[in-house]
Curated annotation (Swiss-Prot):
UniProt name for this protein: IAA-amino acid hydrolase ILR1-like 7
Entry keyword Signal: yes
Similarity section: Belongs to the peptidase M20 family.
Keywords tagged on the record: Hydrolase, Signal
Hydrolase in keyword set: yes
Source organism: Oryza sativa subsp. japonica
Top-level taxon of the source organism: Eukaryota
Any Pfam family matching the protein: Peptidase_M20
Entry EC no(s): 3.5.1.-
InterPro entries in the record: Amidohydrolase, Bact_exopeptidase_dim_dom, ILR1-like_Hyd, Peptidase_M20, Peptidase_M20_dimer
GO BP terms: auxin metabolic process
PANTHER family given in the database record: METALLOPEPTIDASE, PUTATIVE (AFU_ORTHOLOGUE AFUA_6G09600)-RELATED, PEPTIDASE M20 FAMILY MEMBER
The protein's role, per its UniProt record: Hydrolyzes certain amino acid conjugates of the plant growth regulator indole-3-acetic acid (IAA).
Signal peptide extent: 1-25
Length: 455
């Protein structure tokens, strides 16, 4: 018996084989880990699940805190690069929560950092972003927290964005020990036309970021619902100002003048032919002339007329084509009508925004997390929207996902007003939803990518 057992190598090899199998199972290949991460359901890692985060954000004390923040910001709207008071509020709340931050970033911005575990900040870095600036509008909503700043209003929901990100900061800080990486929270200035995102990127505070997520309120969809889509989601956009100069004269003798108003009218009509006859019907493009300024007397043909507006496309190539043709058409009409023309695209003052393109993988990740937070019925596939967003600059740099989050309520709102309306209102039930979704998207991303960042 002793001789037969010592002559066979199988009993000795069996423990070694089992040990190798255990080691391989605990350290899969990077490709296998990545595939598992893409397939994993949301809420599978450490920390709170999406549903738990939403319950925490909806707790009476937490929700009341969010409402108070949003109302304070709403009463004191500030325009692009003027967000001094808003920035002070953000920093005060971060101090109270115990979250460190960098300031100033891009003049008035704040970038907070929540490092998981021991706070060393090793591993994957994920970013969340909210914009802070308001619009030059006089608020016409009659409620106790309306704007106290004449001619300024949060008519695009950036007060809600800032509040939701502060809520996410509080949730993430409470789950700090379970974070498998670092979350950066970007409180960004100057989204409304001044490309604040570009200035944030130029300062290098996001150079270590692996991916980014953002939300924007949408009154067209019901509160508690989000929409998005992979690929192009929001349009690229540019602005133009055309000036046509002729020869002024008496209205009774137009033959002695060179009429710039007629020239401008002809050019404006022809601009729409770019969309109607030069653009593929399956590709979205918009040219909108939004103002025209000429003389101020009934009986005088003015010497010059100016007009301008925006142009938009879902591709960079489409935007470049629109820009080229606007210039050609305005100048050609001026020549035909014996006028001169200049077209200014104001790119130094107002940088054109690229299209916001959702990364396929990041979209799938954010959608899965949103389903975990809101349920399948709360997550819809959206259609492309011809509005533009400087979040696009982040999306050019990192894998990004941008979602619209509903603030409409058919039950409580007599009428739904669009973004940028002086009558725009927000259903504040969105605040805990956005806070929880921000936090869940970040936490689950770090859970999924912890292996590739630390192995």
């Amino acid at each position: 018996m002793a001789a037969s057992s010592s002559s066979s190598p199988l009993p000795l090899a069996l423990p070694l084989l089992l040990l190798l199998l255990v080691l391989f199972a605990s350290h899969p290949s990077p490709h296998a880990a990545a595939a598992a991460a893409d397939a994993a359901p949301a809420g599978g890692g450490g920390g709170g699940s999406g549903g738990e985060l939403l319950s925490a954000a909806r707790a009476p004390g937490f929700a009341a805190w969010l409402r108070g923040l949003r109302r304070s910001i709403h009463r004191h709207p500030e325009l692009a690069f003027e967000e001094v008071r808003t920035s002070e509020l953000v920093r005060a709340e971060l101090d109270a929560i115990g979250v460190p931050y960098e300031w100033p970033v891009a003049r008035t911005g704040v970038v907070a950092t929540i490092a998981g575990g021991d706070g060393a900040g090793a591993g994957t870095v994920f970013a969340l972003r909210a914009d802070m600036d308001a619009l030059p509008l006089q608020e016409l909503v009659d409620w106790e927290h309306k704007s106290e700043e004449s001619g300024k209003m949060h008519a695009c929901g950036h007060d809600a964005h800032t509040t939701m990100l502060l809520g996410a900061a509080k949730l993430l800080q409470s789950q700090k020990d379970d974070l498998k990486g670092t979350v950066k929270l970007v409180f960004q200035p100057a989204e409304e036309g001044y490309a604040g995102a570009r200035y944030v990127l130029q300062e290098g505070v996001l150079d270590d970021v692996s991916a980014i997520f953002g939300l924007h309120v949408d009154p067209r969809i019901q509160v508690g619902t989000v929409t998005s889509r992979p690929g192009p989601f929001l349009a690229a956009s540019g602005r133009f100002l055309a000036t046509i100069t002729g020869k002024g004269g008496h209205a009774a003798g137009p033959h002695n003048a060179v009429d710039p108003i007629l020239t401008a009218s002809s050019a404006i009509v022809s601009l729409q032919q770019i969309v109607a006859r030069e653009t593929d019907p399956l590709e979205a493009a918009v040219i909108s002339v939004t103002f025209m300024k000429g003389g101020d007397a009934y009986n005088v043909i003015p010497e010059s007329v100016s007009f301008g507006g925006t142009f938009r496309s879902l591709t960079s190539e489409g935007l470049s084509y629109l820009k080229k043709r606007i210039k050609e058409i305005v100048e050609a009409h001026a020549t035909v009508h014996r006028c001169t023309a200049t077209v200014d695209f104001m790119e130094e003052e107002r940088i054109p925004y690229p299209a916001t393109v959702n990364d396929e993988g990041m979209y799938r990740h954010a959608r899965a997390v949103a389903v975990d937070v809101l349920g399948e019925d709360g997550v819809k596939v959206g259609t492309p929207f011809m509005g533009s967003e400087d979040f696009a600059f982040y999306a050019q740099r990192f894998p990004a996902a941008f979602f619209m989050i509903g603030v409409g309520n058919e039950t409580t709102m007599r009428k739904v007003y669009p973004l940028h309306s002086p009558h725009f209102v927000v259903d504040e039930d969105v605040l805990p939803v956005g806070a929880a979704l921000h936090a869940a998207v970040a936490m689950e991303y770090l859970n999924k990518h912890a292996f590739t960042a630390t192995f």
